[in-house]
Amino acid sequence: MSKETDRIFAQPLSQVPDFAFNEDVVRVFPDMIKRSVPGYPTIVENLGVLAAQFAQPNTVLYDLGSSLGAVTQALRRHVRGEGCEVIAIDNSSAMVERCREYLNAQDSMFQELLPVQVLEGDILALAFKPASVVALNFTLQFIAPEQRLALLGRIRDALVPGGALILSEKLRFDDPQEQALLTDLHIAFKRANGYSDLEIAQKRSAIENVMKPDSLEEHRQRLLAAGFSKVVPWFQCLNFTSLIALP
């Protein structure tokens, strides 16, 4: 994957535009997310490990909001399910184009990987096939809050017995002191990874109108309302978490 350093917000901007997954972001995305999301590499690699426990023969494994395909690659490395395929979907044409390049490179390095389709489209309009694993890796937070329950309900309906949704998200906290502490710690994490205060502030301004995080309890209650029977947090680092939701 690209090793370009994220410098998108390094210079003062007279007007900070809303964050978008455009070509500029795609070019530096691996660096950006590694330096911005604590625990991201651990989440991605273990998504493959977890998926191998839930994958069922002759089903689909979905990577919804697949970006450059890091989760898709992890699924293909770890899952050996007869008749399984991975479907990765993203609404950014720049992401989809680069994702296909990376997956073609993966095909050239490894044998016996699951077949994969990479689609450009809106996951809200996706016609789900019977699925045993659905990964929503830092995707739900970019969907309008009023549309989240319906999407989760459709995912639940698509899951076969023994399958699972794996949901990773940034968290917000109802307690003001807890929110302030975790925000400060996250800023410290980004500083430690080389981001300046200007970059941190401008990125926050760019993303606050397009990313709307929920609390852990909001996630739990919504998943239960969507028909899931059990919600199990398996990972948290600072204000980022990953959950397993069982049908």
From Swiss-Prot:
Disulfide bonds: none
Residues that bind S-adenosyl-L-methionine: 40, 65-67, 90-91, 122-123, 137, 204
Pfam entry (one): Methyltransf_25
Annotated GO MF terms: carboxyl- or carbamoyltransferase activity; S-adenosyl-L-methionine binding
Keyword Nucleotide-binding set for record: no
EC number: 2.1.3.-
Biological processes, Gene Ontology terms: tRNA wobble uridine modification
The reaction(s) this protein catalyses: prephenate + S-adenosyl-L-methionine = carboxy-S-adenosyl-L-methionine + 3-phenylpyruvate + H2O
Superkingdom, natural source: Bacteria
HAMAP family: Cx_SAM_synthase (MF_01589)
Known role: Catalyzes the conversion of S-adenosyl-L-methionine (SAM) to carboxy-S-adenosyl-L-methionine (Cx-SAM).
Oligomer and partners: Homodimer.
Protein family membership: Belongs to the class I-like SAM-binding methyltransferase superfamily. Cx-SAM synthase family.
Protein name per Swiss-Prot or TrEMBL: Carboxy-S-adenosyl-L-methionine synthase
Name of the gene encoding the protein in the UniProt record: cmoA
